[in-house]
């Protein structure tokens, strides 16, 4: 499907609405399992489907909805008008504008519910990365690129991929019942070192206050210094 076709967006949206509506209505329906699938009881001689089968139906509807949500979120950035909406800003506020992060954690179900639960954790992790490594301005550039994939730079793409992998590891550490004492991946330092060596590719970082934290101190050998030498 062509993501630039708004009819595709409409199709994904309709799938989400239909699956969600059916899922929400299932508990209030008397369902039966017939040779042709599920049906509503309208005859006193027909035995309703078991709770287990009904729950399985609800789960399958939720999975269908989540697949449609993922497809929709992957397609929406191709619509210029959507990029200027509050909804876009919400999903673009982290490095994970789609449900990919749930897949990276090996979670198959429920994807959308898990994504919404993970967002506060992701936001806390990215705040730490902003203040200690990347800076707000450069993170905003990376987030926009994660959403739109508009950059032609292989280096930028590789940095974003590495940064997201670091975040996934940090999420795993936070979700672990026995988190590591020092869960910060060394890859973050490596990312900063690469950024330092390529000022033309990462202008926002080099123009930020965070860059000064990574500039080596130059010893000037002043007479007042204890280590002064002739």
Describe the role of every protein-language-model region.
Residues 1-14, 28-230:
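Conserved short "hinge" loops at termini or chain/domain junctions
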Residues 17:
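Catalytic-loop motifs flanking and including active-site residues across diverse enzymes
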């Amino acid at each position: 499907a062509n993501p630039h076709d708004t009819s595709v967006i409409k199709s994904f949206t309709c799938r989400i609405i239909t699956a969600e509506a059916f899922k929400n209505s299932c508990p209030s329906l008397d369902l039966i399992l017939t040779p042709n699938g599920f049906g509503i009881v309208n005859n006193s001689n027909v035995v309703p489907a078991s709770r287990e089968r009904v729950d399985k139906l609800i789960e399958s509807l939720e999975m269908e909805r989540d697949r449609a949500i993922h497809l929709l979120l992957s397609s929406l950035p191709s619509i210029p008008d959507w990029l200027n909406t509050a909804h876009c800003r919400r999903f673009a506020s982290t490095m994970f504008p789609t449900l990919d992060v749930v897949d990276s954690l090996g979670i198959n179900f429920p994807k959308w519910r898990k994504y919404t639960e993970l967002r506060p954790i992701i936001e806390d992790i990215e705040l730490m990365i902003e203040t200690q490594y990347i800076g707000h301005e450069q993170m905003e550039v990376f987030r926009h690129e994660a959403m739109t994939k508009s950059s032609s730079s292989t280096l930028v793409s590789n940095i974003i991929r590495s940064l997201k992998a670091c975040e996934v590891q940090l999420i795993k550490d936070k979700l672990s019942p026995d988190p590591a004492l020092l869960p910060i991946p060394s890859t973050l330092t490596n990312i900063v070192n690469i950024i330092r060596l390529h000022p033309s590719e990462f202008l926002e970082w080099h123009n930020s206050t965070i860059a000064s934290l990574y500039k080596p101190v130059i010893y000037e050998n002043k007479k007042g210094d204890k280590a002064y030498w002739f």
